[in-house]
Design a protein with these regions (language model features):
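Short, hinge-like loop/turn segments at secondary-structure boundaries
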Residues: 338-341, 368-369, 428-432
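Short, surface-exposed secondary-structure edge patches
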Residues: 112, 269-271, 290, 339-343
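Short alpha-helix capping/helix-loop boundary micro-motifs
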Residues: 165, 334-340
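Protease-associated
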Residues: 212-295, 358-363, 375, 379-383, ...
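C-terminal domain-closing interface element
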Residues: 183, 188-190, 345-393, 399
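Nucleotide/phosphate-binding sheet-loop regions of phosphoryl- and nucleotidyl-transfer enzymes
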Residues: 1-240, 276-279, 286-288, 297, ...
Length: 480
């Protein structure tokens, strides 16, 4: 196959030659010249002439779709979405509808509900005299779908009717592509639309209220992986739409955080005590950083993966964390780092998304998590129909109290070594680990026993009679 990049180079050269910036500004003669260049490039790369028989071209296109099932991107997508490899793919062969044959033509992409908020109503974009690729590629600025009504009133009225028919049939929010050719509407495809976690909850509840889904079906519509993000602060959906990530790491602990950059745990603690919201930026974290990690709104590390110290501790504390952003060039001594060609100093504002791993310049407003509204309704329905009890991992009285508030019916695992991460306790714990004699070890144990006894008592009180499974000390030595 010939990669798309070879043809893009030829298109860019032609646009530069003609002094235009958009593909649609090229004339028919320009496109004919480009077609000859494309054929020459194809022969250069493949070694044979480009086939001119339409049937041969069609079969080549079909085979290309089948081959795409094995490309790296498809394999990653299947793995992330639990799609079996054995399914294979299908090819639809259909007559073409042209949206680029003049000003009475156009193309668009639309959702029957807002995929960010879940609000009912048409949401999408439309372009006149264009093909579908132009809408999603960003080469031209599209119009809001509502503006289609002024340009093509009859097609728009028909489109609204079709949207309702499709949503009523599939009983879910639809993501549709369509073309208008000389004023006539052609529907190209529809599918259940992707949506944010918040939108998923609203859509599921609204479909129940509209009589299209049962409560049990609404619960089944929610991807459980999305719920984790809803238990942490989130970026305001409207503000997030306007923001562009400047970097990306691993989404190690969900939630959203924004604040002023600090580079040491001590600074994080000191700034937080003054009422400042801070994001702790480190090459990597260690147990000595625990007080600063607790004081910070979020944690960003250059090194480390999903099981690094920063990731594990942040998840345990419910703190937003992005780890392993190797694009950051860090200078800890001078308290500065470089990302996306810009220098960031102590005190500069930054925002991080622990669910996606995205990093943003500046402050993006956040909204707190709560089991209320649609989230509360969905969880109430889940409780109504579930057959399993749910327990949680909790290692401290604070964790247990929060878990109980969020509906946990006990603790499935309490990792007792996590009780000793605090600065006031970790020294005694290290004494116990490093003791050379039994006497020294028992002396250290005498120091830590009151901490543990107090925590156990507080754990039991927080759980109000619910069960707890205690794991005796099992400390990974590198964490202490």
């Amino acid at each position: 196959e010939v990669g798309k990049k070879y043809f893009e180079v030829l298109i860019d050269e032609m646009k530069n030659k003609k002094g235009v910036t958009q593909d649609v500004e090229l004339t028919a003669e320009d496109l004919q010249e480009l077609a000859e260049q494309f054929k020459a490039e194809y022969k250069k790369q493949i070694g044979v002439d480009f086939p001119t028989d339409p049937k041969e071209q069609l079969m080549g296109a079909i085979e290309a779709v089948f081959r795409s099932w094995d490309n790296p991107r498809a394999n990653v997508y299947r793995r992330d979405n639990d799609i079996p490899y054995s399914w294979g793919t299908a090819v639809n062969v259909q007559a073409m509808a042209f949206g680029n044959m003049g000003d009475d033509c156009g193309t668009g992409v639309a959702f029957t509900r807002d995929p960010s908020t879940g609000a009912k109503g048409l949401f999408g974009e439309f372009l006149t005299n264009a093909q579908g690729e132009d809408v999603v590629a960003g080469v031209r600025t599209p119009m809001h779908i509502s503006e289609m009504e002024q340009k093509f009133p009859e097609a728009f009225a028909q489109f609204k009717t079709v949207c309702k028919t499709l949503e009523d049939h599939y009983r879910d929010m639809q993501d549709m592509e369509f073309t208008v050719e000389h004023g006539k509407l052609y529907m190209l495809q529809t599918r259940n639309g992707k949506r944010t976690a918040q939108a998923a909850l609203k859509i599921a509840c609204d479909l129940v209220d509209e009589g299209m889904r049962t409560e049990e079906e609404a619960v089944a519509m929610i991807d459980p992986r999305n719920l984790d993000t809803l238990l942490h602060p989130q970026f305001d959906a409207t503000a997030l739409k306007a923001a562009t990530p400047m970097g990306k790491g691993l989404g190690a602990s969900p939630g959203a955080a924004c604040g002023k950059i600090v580079f040491t745990a001590d600074d994080a603690t000191a700034w937080a005590e003054k009422g400042e919201k801070v994001v702790l930026v480190r090459l990597e974290t260690s147990p000595e950083d625990i007080t600063g990690m607790k004081a910070a709104e979020g944690i960003l590390t250059v090194r480390g993966g999903m099981t690094s110290h920063a990731a594990v501790v942040a998840r345990g504390m419910g703190t937003c964390c992005v780890s392993g952003c190797s694009d950051i060039n860090m200078d800890e001594d001078n308290k500065v780092f470089t990302l996306a060609g810009k220098e960031f100093h102590e005190g500069d504002p930054i925002s991080i998304d622990g669910s996606t791993g995205n990093i943003y310049d500046g402050i993006i407003p956040t909204v707190p998590a709560s089991i209320a509204g649609e989230f509360g309704r969905i969880m109430t329905w889940a409780d109504k129909y579930r057959t399993l009890k749910v327990r949680t991992n909790a290692d401290t009285p604070e964790d247990a109290k929060r878990a109980k508030e969020l509906g946990a019916e006990g603790i499935g695992l309490c990792r007792t070594e996590h009780m000793f991460f605090e600065e006031s306790r970790i020294a005694a714990f290290r004494e116990m680990i490093c003791a050379d004699t039994v006497e020294e070890r028992e002396k250290a144990l005498d120091k830590i026993m009151p901490y543990q006894q107090g925590d156990f008592e507080a754990l039991y009180e927080a759980l109000e009679g619910n069960p707890v499974t205690i794991r005796f000390l099992d400390p990974p030595l590198h964490e202490f």
